[in-house]
Regions:
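Charged, alpha-helix-forming regions
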Residues: 1-242
Length: 242
């Protein structure tokens, strides 16, 4: 029964996470599809990324200089084409900016870096020219599905020149702030669920294992008691016969 309860809980938590992700994606797509929703009463300007942002690929760094874990010496986050790659000693970027992966099957993947960090040659750093709330820009780039602009081939790629031609909405700053706040809240909920789900499942598994082991221990102890009683009875019978 404990196994069934654990499986049922896992299914429920996974369904909850999936539902929240779909809800987040729905609101993100609704809020970032300008001129279509709100009965067409809301319009905004559209600009190419090259007009409103500076785009520059990072710099190559030998794999030997990247640590998989963060230490006192290797304390700077290092981002590649698919997000966080590891940690390095020194940074080559500063500030809160979206990064776009530019090589491989997942090119077009967007992550968000803050503070000081290192961007490799497989990541394009997107620097705002004064038009955006950086979090709104991040969400807009995710919504743009940049992977659709990749070049075909054994090693798909996404060039800076092609990214510069992609058009994105540039609403008023006040609207950007409001949209970014809503989407960040949903993002935080999904992140909490992502963290909480494995922890909750692990806790239930440990609880199941604890009760299982306790029951097995009781069963084993009961067998020992029964065996001892049988031995005592046999001893008594032998004594009586004598």
């Amino acid at each position: 029964i404990f196994t069934e309860l654990t499986a049922e809980l896992t299914a429920e938590l996974t369904a909850e996470l999936t539902a929240r992700k779909k809800q987040y994606e729905y609101y993100r797509d609704t809020l970032l599809t300008f001129g279509v929703h709100r009965e067409g009463t809301f319009e905004t300007k559209w600009r190419t990324l090259g007009e409103v942002c500076g785009l520059q690929a990072g710099k190559a760094i030998p794999a030997i200089e990247i640590s998989p874990v963060q230490t006192k010496e290797y304390s700077v986050p290092c981002y590649g084409g698919n997000g966080l790659r590891g940690y390095v000693k020194t940074a080559n970027q500063q500030g809160d900016k979206p990064l776009v992966g530019r090589q491989g099957a997942l090119c077009g993947n967007v992550c968000y870096a803050t503070g000081s960090y290192y961007a490799t040659e497989h990541a394009v750093v997107v620097s705002d020219k004064g038009f955006f709330n950086s979090r709104f820009l991040y969400h807009a780039l995710v919504h743009a599905n940049l992977n659709q602009y990749k070049t075909a081939g054994a090693q798909p790629g996404l060039s800076v020149a092609k990214l510069e031609k992609v058009k994105i909405p540039v609403p008023e700053k006040e609207i950007q702030d409001r949209i970014a706040k809503v989407l960040d809240n949903f993002d935080a909920i999904c992140s909490d669920l992502n963290i909480g789900l494995p922890a909750e499942i692990e806790a239930r598994k440990k609880q199941y294992e604890y009760y299982r082991d306790m029951l097995l221990t009781f069963a084993a102890a009961d067998d020992i008691i029964l065996t001892d009683r049988q031995t005592d009875r046999q001893t008594d019978r032998q004594t009586d016969r004598q």
